[in-house]
């Protein structure tokens, strides 16, 4: 099981709305040899973290099957980010596309990049809510806690995350 988080909060070359960019990123990820998309979460709207005057983000998670070398997959995702207009610069800056590897088959890896599982995924409801859509039984490999318990740990202090009716999409 491979989990990849997809997010955006700026228009980019693939669309005027962040969800358009996220959907196109899903199509691009589907073209990675050796991987198959099993599920795509609903698209959730979330406030930027840390809080700022940036536009809200669209966030989702993909469940993939297949085999992936972590460093190779990271390079492939960063290439897709560049195609989607991502320019790396200031930490936590607004972006046209953000793709993060959350987990690859429960692998625990401290480096080189990517660190797995994603070191902050368990602290982010905008990752955990869509992750629960596609992998409700997922257990964070370092903590040994499932996604439902991780979400319960965050209640009441991690910002607003909404799933508006017009944002969800099913992958074709």
Briefly describe each language-model feature range.
Residues 1-35, 40-45:
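N-terminal beta1-alpha1 ligand-phosphate binding loop
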Residues 2, 33-39, 56-60, 95-99, ...:
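A generic structural signal for short beta-strands and their flanking turns/coil linkers
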Residues 8, 62-66, 105-106:
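Short beta-strand-to-loop capping motifs
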Residues 14-15, 63-66, 130:
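Short, surface-exposed loop/turn motifs that are enriched in glycine and acidic residues
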Residues 22, 26, 59-61, 74-77:
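A general structural signal for well-ordered alpha-helical packing
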Residues 39-65:
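Short, charge-patterned binding micro-sites
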Residues 49-56, 71-74, 79-172:
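Flexible, gly/pro- and Lys/Arg-enriched active-site loops
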């Amino acid at each position: 099981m491979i989990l990849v988080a997809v997010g955006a909060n700026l228009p980019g070359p693939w669309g005027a709305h962040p969800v358009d960019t996220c959907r196109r990123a899903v199509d691009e990820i589907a073209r990675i040899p050796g991987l198959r998309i099993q599920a795509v979460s609903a698209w959730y709207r979330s406030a930027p973290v840390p809080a700022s005057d940036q536009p809200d983000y669209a966030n989702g998670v993909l469940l993939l099957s297949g085999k992936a070398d972590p460093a190779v997959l990271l390079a492939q995702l960063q290439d897709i980010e560049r195609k989607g207009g991502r320019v790396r610069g200031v930490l936590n800056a607004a972006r046209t596309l953000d793709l993060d590897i959350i987990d690859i088959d429960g692998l625990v890896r401290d480096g080189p990049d990517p660190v797995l599982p994603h070191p902050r995924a368990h602290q982010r409801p905008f990752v955990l809510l869509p992750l629960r859509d596609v992998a409700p039984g997922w257990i964070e490999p370092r903590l040994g806690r499932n996604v439902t318990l991780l979400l319960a740990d965050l209640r009441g202090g991690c910002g607003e995350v909404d799933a508006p009716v017009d944002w969800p999409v099913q992958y074709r």
